[in-house]
């Protein structure tokens, strides 16, 4: 799926969902960014969990290794 300027795939940590999806998932709502954080799609960015020891780099929209 398109996410920001990138496509959500292997190693990536975000994808776009409509605002109603964010509301439906309830407890995951806090993982959905405000719609203004996306392009002009009106969708919210939803951040998938990264592997252990990784974090989501919102600049590159990818999972990066944590540095000590």
Swiss-Prot record:
Membrane-spanning ranges: none
UniProt keyword terms in alphabetical order: Disulfide bond, Secreted
Protein name: U1-hexatoxin-Hv1a
Pfam family, one: MIT_LIKE_ACTX
Disulphide bridges: 3-14, 8-22, 13-48, 32-56, 50-63
Cellular localization per UniProt: Secreted
Predominant location: secreted
